[in-house]
Amino acid sequence: MTLSIVKSEDSSSRPSAVPSDLPLEEDIINTLPSGVFVQDRYKAWMTVIINVVMVGLGWLGIAIAPWFLLPVVWVFTGTALTGFFVIGHDCGHRSFSRNVWVNDWVGHILFLPIIYPFHSWRIGHNQHHKYTNRMELDNAWQPWRKEEYQNAGKFMQVTYDLFRGRAWWIGSILHWASIHFDWTKFEGKQRQQVKFSSLLVIGAAAIAFPTMILTIGVWGFVKFWVIPWLVFHFWMSTFTLLHHTIADIPFREPEQWHEAESQLSGTVHCNYSRWGEFLCHDINVHIPHHVTTAIPWYNLRTPTPVYRKIGGEYLYPECDFSWGLMKQVVDHAICMMRITIISQSLTTKRV
């Protein structure tokens, strides 16, 4: 799902195309300091402890804050919950621990408060890494082709414009609800894993939600869980959108797609506030992560100078998060789509 429509033309402001023979593994990964791949158990578990404390402080703040401070505490708590996801994200890439079972169980536990099925996300996310910005195969913010948009009914066009436009922050919820609970799409061991993860979070929600409503009421449930959960999904939508969807970065058709280009030119480093990057564990330092998922989050900043030295001309310039940037990103594709449709309509009428 994406707000972007595939563009056939190249923008003059986007990074240079990466040569098709770029030896990504040899030229970049092998030049990295070996220490960036080392998993530090102390750092990994301290991250978990700090994140649990932050979420706990957030919930305490919700309990004691006067009404006019609740929005601030909600944003803090939802951002801290996003940190749970980021640690689980490392677990999904097996960069949290050398033991697969530790990664799986930590991932499941941290995904429980946000009701996210771990294995279905893990499997789908690995596909996103393998086919970043490739039409038909990348499952993160997959765009519509222009002809698909034209052939869709008016209702679907309006829906597309809304949820891939100014309501982008709902995109993560739609992705979560429509993709991650269907274990019938998988086969063999993966089907059993996805079924386990899905039933685990469904069971947890079936117990936790009624219990919260009975003990603290509907407003308490909304105040302590629903609103922080919505903040979490705001960040999920925003992070994942800006990682690979800037006006000058297109999704490519299979015959035009190149893996090295998608990982370098198609990935964006966007800076956020220090407190946000702290609570979300540098999830914005995304280029090193897309070159190799073996780097734990706490080492992601170390190889950045290496990437800039080797592939600097191919990297999209760093940007800073702002509402102006979000407006530019979410408005660009919809505007381009409407211009294209109007132009084609006028051309047809003239003919």
Swiss-Prot record:
Chain location of the short sequence motif Histidine box-2 per the record: 125-129
Induction, as annotated: Expression is light and temperature-dependent with a decrease with decreased light conditions or lower temperatures.
This protein's pathway reads:
Lipid metabolism; polyunsaturated fatty acid biosynthesis
User: Which Pfam families does the annotation name?
Assistant: FA_desaturase (PF00487)
Q: What is its EC number?
A: 1.14.19.45
Report one GO cellular component: plasma membrane-derived thylakoid membrane
What are the alphabetically sorted keywords of the record? Fatty acid biosynthesis, Fatty acid metabolism, Iron, Lipid biosynthesis, Lipid metabolism, Membrane, Oxidoreductase, Thylakoid, Transmembrane, Transmembrane helix
GO MF annotations for this entry?
acyl-CoA (9+3)-desaturase activity
Motif Histidine box-1 in this chain = 89-93
GO annotation terms (biological process): unsaturated fatty acid biosynthetic process
State the span of motif (Histidine box-3): 289-293
Q: Which InterPro entries match?
A: FA_desaturase_dom, Fatty_acid_desaturase
Which cofactors are required for activity? Fe(2+)
Which cell locations does it reside in?
Cellular thylakoid membrane
Top-tier EC class: oxidoreductase
Domain remarks in the Swiss-Prot or TrEMBL record: The histidine box domains are involved in binding the catalytic metal ions.
Q: What is the protein's name according to its record?
A: sn-1 oleoyl-lipid 12-desaturase
Q: Which organism is it from?
A: Arthrospira platensis
Q: What is the lineage of its organism?
A: Bacteria, Bacillati, Cyanobacteriota, Cyanophyceae, Oscillatoriophycideae
